[in-house]
Amino acid sequence: MAEAGGAGSPALPPAPPHGSPRTLATAAGSSASCGPATAVAAAGTAEGPGGGGSARIAVKKAQLRSAPRAKKLEKLGVYSACKAEESCKCNGWKNPNPSPTPPRGDLQQIIVSLTESCRSCSHALAAHVSHLENVSEEEMDRLLGIVLDVEYLFTCVHKEEDADTKQVYFYLFKLLRKSILQRGKPVVEGSLEKKPPFEKPSIEQGVNNFVQYKFSHLPSKERQTTIELAKMFLNRINYWHLEAPSQRRLRSPNDDISGYKENYTRWLCYCNVPQFCDSLPRYETTKVFGRTLLRSVFTIMRRQLLEQARQEKDKLPLEKRTLILTHFPKFLSMLEEEVYSQNSPIWDQDFLSASSRTSPLGIQTVISPPVTGTALFSSNSTSHEQINGGRTSPGCRGSSGLEANPGEKRKMNNSHAPEEAKRSRVMGDIPVELINEVMSTITDPAGMLGPETNFLSAHSARDEAARLEERRGVIEFHVVGNSLNQKPNKKILMWLVGLQNVFSHQLPRMPKEYITRLVFDPKHKTLALIKDGRVIGGICFRMFPSQGFTEIVFCAVTSNEQVKGYGTHLMNHLKEYHIKHEILNFLTYADEYAIGYFKKQGFSKEIKIPKTKYVGYIKDYEGATLMGCELNPQIPYTEFSVIIKKQKEIIKKLIERKQAQIRKVYPGLSCFKDGVRQIPIESIPGIRETGWKPSGKEKSKEPKDPEQLYSTLKNILQQVKNHPNAWPFMEPVKRTEAPGYYEVIRFPMDLKTMSERLRNRYYVSKKLFMADLQRVFTNCKEYNPPESEYYKCASILEKFFFSKIKEAGLIDK
């Protein structure tokens, strides 16, 4: 950076050598990687802001601002023109004795005297900074902040491969360089003369309008849940990384690239780059862009968000998992219709005034999305309402879902906190990158070969057709019940009568009076299946929370609507409803005609709960068989068949990839023709080349005595912690120091956590211990650039670790 040109057209120093694109050529020796736009995937990414670069820049700025004034003047002199003589054309002071290698930090460098001569013009440093003699510390700190931003952008210019992005980086580089020379504030001009907001209504206002338009009629608790979903969506847009125009041109050649390029440039200048260069004013994407940008990213963003949600579901609390996996897809589908609709009212300029006349809800206060966190789903989990008879339960309502108490301040629930995110990974697992690559193929219709899949295949899941109908709004599910405490709702009463008729018609051996008594009993509830406004099926049940089970009394679907998957989907909704209410056991008496159905839904004649729990509570039926079903709270039952299908597709694609890698083809086995019934797997020709390993062949070297293993691992871990290069890995990475770290690193690990695990006797084998410590090094190298000090520490410590486990005899030397 010491060779930078003047204000009008700064000349960049030569680019790093071809073989080292990540080499940083800044005067400060920054180890920060470039901004998030440098690693944009072909369809955009949902990574956290700055990729950790913003934290590193903030640390360097704090260090520099706390330095002595002489050090600050030296730094600013590099970017200040010489004023000794009018004829001197030197644009920046050059240190005559530059360090041969970048030191560990700026503050460790020797402070240069103001009388030190410039290597270029031979004038003193004082001649370059004479205009800064009477400048306040506050102004000097502001200029120093711009200096570090310039150096960071300089790195980005050289590292960026996309021409459009590089051009924007270079423009901002020149803008900030000029601001330093002229001591002014950077103002984006030129082709970007239009100032934010660029379109009205904004994305935030449009989503506000959408919530008002679609959900204002709901009770406050149900509406609050929708608001939480909207907050999650807006938060993700604010940290969404747009794909470069060149990538979009390849993916969608028929799109309006010129319009997208304009929005992309604005997004870089006003939203993205200011995340890590805070000398530029920053705007939230949702506040300055509108429908046009949202349309260009919504489809791919929706797909990736849902996929990421499914991948991270195990990290989420039960309530939030149900909210995200069950209700977030429905929310996005409804919003998608309004985004691409030509006449949706949510994008009208006068929607605010029109809605204020019809709704008591203040549209301005519906959603106020925070831009403080980068977790994928930052909305807090919500509480549940005990269902009152005579009203529909939001627990199974497709348009809303869970409820949250209005007016109650919810604490931030960091689902990606370090403690929660520490998940052990199975040894030999398939790399996440490969899974994501396969997922992008099987979820992208353009990437799949073969016939169209508009129609259901012969091997579709039983509930697939019903699930599709629910998404299209053809069918609905509502938990209903009678009430003695309040005036019954007319619609609910009509549905209860409809349920009575369905049960009576489909269960002719059951007395009609008995059916009527139970359906209208306030202690019983019914999950009703509604199609075209009328009841076509349902499951009547009674919950016993104190006993930990629910009794299923009636279950039926009208005869002309059977064999469509409604029964399976109905039961899956009932399972998810009970998971929300933390009741994980079903009991029912099934007659000879119903046993087959209940077996398909996971029921068994083996009852898992003690007999004392249900005797005297459940109704006994002569000639019927008692069956039970235990629910797994980690399974999203309404999407379970989709997940299984997706897993099968992934395995199939992975097998195809492996087959393509194996060039040699072996003849088929002929031994079975000779009467051989069985052969060892390892004797199959080519089996080892596929990556298969015999489980019994690897002789473990680890000590058989648990105490001996504990002592050995404790000794190794202590030596690793005492190593001089172990300092970056002693504690979990803090979010404040590295924003976006837990978006990049899925399985964090540190030496403190390992010490706790060792103390709790978690490491029952050497493999678990080695996997955790290897994860420490892998995470560091994945997040930090190769030339950074953290990366070097990880490499040195990794070699030391392997030398120690070899000395301990845990692996072959």
From Swiss-Prot:
Active site: E551 (proton donor/acceptor)
Biased composition, class Basic and acidic residues, residue ranges: 406-423
Catalytic activity: L-lysyl-[histone] + acetyl-CoA = N(6)-acetyl-L-lysyl-[histone] + CoA + H(+); L-lysyl-[protein] + acetyl-CoA = N(6)-acetyl-L-lysyl-[protein] + CoA + H(+); spermidine + acetyl-CoA = N(8)-acetylspermidine + CoA + H(+)
Residue ranges constituting the Bromo domain according to the UniProt record: 704-808
Inactivation phenotype: No visible phenotype.
EC number: 2.3.1.48, 2.3.1.57
Keywords linked to the UniProt accession: Activator, Acyltransferase, Biological rhythms, Bromodomain, Cell cycle, Cytoplasm, Cytoskeleton, Nucleus, Transcription, Transcription regulation, Transferase
Subcellular localization(s) per the UniProt record: Nucleus; Cytoplasm, Cytoskeleton, Microtubule organizing center, Centrosome
Enzyme class name: transferase
Gene3D superfamilies: 3.40.630.30, Bromodomain-like
Record-listed acetyl-CoA binding positions: C555, A556, V557, Q562, V563, K564, G565, Y566, G567, T568, Y593, A594, I595, G596
Comp. bias intervals (Polar residues): 380-391
Record-level GO cellular component terms: A band; actomyosin; ATAC complex; centrosome; cytosol; histone acetyltransferase complex; I band; kinetochore
Subunit structure: Interacts with BCAS3. Interacts with SIRT1. Interacts with EP300, CREBBP and DDX17. Component of a large chromatin remodeling complex, at least composed of MYSM1, KAT2B/PCAF, RBM10 and KIF11/TRIP5. Interacts with KLF1; the interaction does not acetylate KLF1 and there is no enhancement of its transactivational activity. Interacts with NFE4. Interacts with MECOM. Interacts with NR2C2 (hypophosphorylated and unsumoylated form); the interaction promotes the transactivation activity of NR2C2. Interacts with NFE4. Interacts with MECOM.
PANTHER family: GH11602P (PTHR45750), HISTONE ACETYLTRANSFERASE KAT2B (PTHR45750:SF2)
Full protein name: Histone acetyltransferase KAT2B
Gene that this sequence comes from: Kat2b
